[in-house]
Amino acid sequence: MANAIIETAKERFAQSHQSLSREYASIRAGRANASLLDRIQVDYYGAPTPLNQLASITVPEARVLLISPFDKSSIKDIERALNASDLGITPANDGSVIRLVIPALTEETRKELAKEVKKVGENAKIAIRNIRRDAMDDAKKQEKAKEITEDELKTLEKDIQKATDDAIKEIDRMTAEKEKELLSG
C-alpha cells in the first residue's frame, strides 16, 4: 500500500512534467516549430477542432510555418483561428495554403518570454509540492489507520521527499534549457 502512494505521486509528477513540456513547446523561440500551433482550435462546422486535424503543418524554412488544409474550404476558418490566437503572428493566406512567418525576437521580447518561462516553471513546482502534500497526507492516514507503522511512515515520507526533489530538479533543468534557448536566440 505504501508503494502505491509513491507510484501514484511519481505518475502525477510525470504528468506535470509532460504538461510543462507542452507549455514550453508553445512558447516561441524565434524559430518555426509546428508545436507552436498545438493549442490552436479551429471552429470547423460549429465544433472546435485541433488545427493539426484539419491541415498538415510543415516547416519549409527556419522561420516559416506552412499550413496546408486538407479541405480547402476550411482555410478561412483556420485563418480566423490563427488571428484570434495569442501567437502575435499574422497569417498570409494565398487561397490554398497559409504561411506564418515567425518574426525574429527582439532582446526585450526574449527577456519577457524568459520571465514567462520562469513563471510557468514556478507554477509547475507548486503543482509538484501539492502532489507531495497529498502523498504525505495519504501516508499519515495509513499510519493513523494502523496500516503502516511509525517507522514505515518515516521511511515513506523520506521516499516521497526524494521523489519530490527529483521532480523539482527536472523542472529546474527544463526551465534552464528553455531560458537558454530563448536568450541565445
UniProtKB/Swiss-Prot annotation:
Source species, domain of life: Bacteria
GO biological process: translational termination
Keywords for this protein: Cytoplasm, Protein biosynthesis
Major localisation: cytoplasm
MF (Gene Ontology): ribosomal large subunit binding
Keyword Protein biosynthesis applies: yes
Gene Ontology cellular-component terms listed: cytoplasm
Gene3D superfamilies: 3.30.1360.40, Ribosome-recycling factor
A UniProt-annotated Pfam family: RRF
Localization in the cell: Cytoplasm
Family: Belongs to the RRF family.
PANTHER family linked: MITOCHONDRIAL RIBOSOME RECYCLING FACTOR PSEUDO 1, RIBOSOME RECYCLING FACTOR
Chain's role: Responsible for the release of ribosomes from messenger RNA at the termination of protein biosynthesis. May increase the efficiency of translation by recycling ribosomes from one round of translation to another.
Descriptive protein name: Ribosome-recycling factor
